Structures are given as C-alpha cells and as structure tokens.
Amino acid sequence: METDNGKGLILAVASSVFIGSSFILKKKGLKRAGAIGTRAGYGGYTYLLEPLWWAGMVTMIVGEAANFVAYIYAPAVLVTPLGALSIIISAVLAHFLLKEKLKKMGVLGCVSCIVGSVVIVIHAPKEQTPNSVEEIWNLATQPAFLIYVAITMSIVLALILHFEPLCGQTNILVYIGICSLMGALTVMSIKAIGIAIKLTMEGVSQIGYPQTWLFVMVAVTCVVTQLIYLNKALDTFNAAIVSPVYYVMFTTLTIVASAIMFKDWSGQDAASVASELCGFITVLTGTMILHGTREEEQQQASSEHVRWYDSRKSMNEEHLVSLYSPEY
C-alpha cells in the first residue's frame, strides 16, 4: 500500500472509533435532556445544557478531525467506506450501554462490514493530489459536478420544506437523507480545504485564493445542517438504526460525488474497480443486516405486547401505543 494511503487508513480507523463512541454519548445525552425539556426531535435545544451530549460532541469532533486529515492523504473511495467500523463500535456500545441488544445476525453484519472494508483497502486507488486550490475549484465547477450539486440541493430543499413537516417524525429517510446529501458536499469541500492546508504547510500558500474561503463557507454551512438533522434523527429513532442507514446513504452519495468531482477510478483497471465495488456492496450488506436485526426485534416486541409499533422514540425506550391503554 502506498505511504499516503497507509496514513489515511490509520486515521480513518481511529476516526471510526471516536465517531462510533460519540453516537452513544450523544444519544444518552439527548435522552437525559428530553426528560427535562423539549426533545430535539420536536425542535428543542435543551441538549445544549447536557454535559454528556457535549462529551459526545467533543468525541465526534476528534473523530471528524482524524477523518478530515485522512481525506488529505487518501481518496474518498478508501476513507469513506471505512466509516462502517463506526457502526460496529456504536452497535457494540449500544448493546452494553443503551440495552439495544446485538444478536447473532448483528454479529454477522459486523463481520461483513469488516470483510468488505478489508477488500476496499486492498484495492484502493492512489489519488493524484491537485497542485493548487484553483485546480480543485476547476474540478468543482465542471458541468457534471455542478449538475450533481443542483440535484442535491433541490432534493434537500424538498425534504426540508415539504417532507419534514409531513413525515419527518415517522420516516427515518427524511432526516438521514438531509444529513447524507449535505454530508457528501461536506466531504468534497473538506477535502479541498485539507489539500489547501497541506499545500500551504509545504510552502505553497493557498490562503490568498478566494476559492479557499468559498470552500470553507460551504463546509461550515453543510456541517451545521448535518448536525441539526442528525440530532433530530438520533432523538427520534433508535441509534442502532440511525447509524447503519446514515452510513449507507452517506457513503454511497460521497463515493458518487467523489467519482464525479475527483475521478477517483480514473486509471484503474476493471478488476480493481470491480473488487472495490464488491467490497462496498459487502459493507452495505453488513449494515443492512444490522438494520434488519433491529427491525425484527422491534416487530417482535410489538407482537409480544399486542401493540402497534411506532418508529419514533420516546424519552425512555421505543414508543409503543397499547391497544389496551386507557387513553385509547
């Protein structure tokens, strides 16, 4: 493996450990905050006063910082799929700390994620680093990528303005869709900023270029939007479901965006590209197994208690509406 790819690999793995842990810390913080004030899923910001939520935020920031540097050294097609490791971390911790059980099929899902990640690492392409932020800007303003951005923003606006009020509290794809679409743009801008910082540290200053600051503005806007809707998703839905669904959507969209903007697969033979895709599909399969395991458990709980299952989360556990409740 190339030296730069090796550095990116180590940083990506470390990032996954921190980010996976942060999901659990933030989840526990959100549950505590929801018990004393308006929940984040309903527009509340009580969690900002909860120390445990801030501990999760700090952990996530450390993980994202490691991820940020990883994108400087390695292509998105290598770094992004390794985020599956954070799902394993969060699933295991959720099993012990949130009492969200991880059964045999869940373990199989974790193993699939690891196997797929290894295949991707072995066949990852070596990235050609741009020589200036202007060169990155030229990549970002090519017609194909501009069309991608236009489609992305149209979908995000539709989700926020139309679908969130309509079904945001019952359909996980609304909140996660917004996070993932904005997340793909975040990665592209963060990668541009990282390369600009690297070039500046090597003596080729990129600070004076207006394109550098445009990328910073895009990154800040996208990150803030991601955080708002990720908090809503975590507060409304089960953490063991949010993590894999977010990963699948975010990773897929990021790889698509990177392939369009940076042409990651240019120069690779068909066998290597096919191997990477197979590895990616294996990882996706693992995350879907984890997701399916959680859904099966929830349906069983609903059946055992003769209740209707509501996909939303209460302040304590899954929100179940009993047929025999005196309220109904």
From Swiss-Prot:
CC annotations in GO: early endosome; endoplasmic reticulum; plasma membrane
Localization (cell): Cell membrane; Early endosome
Keyword Cell cycle assigned: no
Domain of life: Eukaryota
Coiled-coil stretches: none
Gene Ontology molecular-function annotations: magnesium ion transmembrane transporter activity
Entries under InterPro entries matching the protein: Mg_trans_NIPA
Record keywords: Cell membrane, Endosome, Ion transport, Magnesium, Membrane, Transmembrane, Transmembrane helix, Transport
Membrane topology: Multi-pass membrane protein
Transmembrane domains' residue ranges: 5-25, 52-72, 77-97, 105-125, 143-163, 176-196, 210-230, 241-261, 270-290
Residues in the Cytoplasmic compartment per record: 26-51, 98-104, 164-175, 231-240, 291-328
Ranges per topology, Extracellular: 1-4, 73-76, 126-142, 197-209, 262-269
One GO term (biological process): defense response to virus
SUPFAM superfamilies reported for this sequence: Multidrug resistance efflux transporter EmrE
Family assignment from sequence similarity: Belongs to the NIPA (TC 2.A.7) family.
Its job: Acts as a Mg(2+) transporter. Can also transport other divalent cations such as Fe(2+), Sr(2+), Ba(2+), Mn(2+) and Co(2+) but to a much less extent than Mg(2+).
Assembly information from the UniProt record: Homodimer.
Name assigned to this protein: Probable magnesium transporter NIPA6
Organism: Arabidopsis thaliana
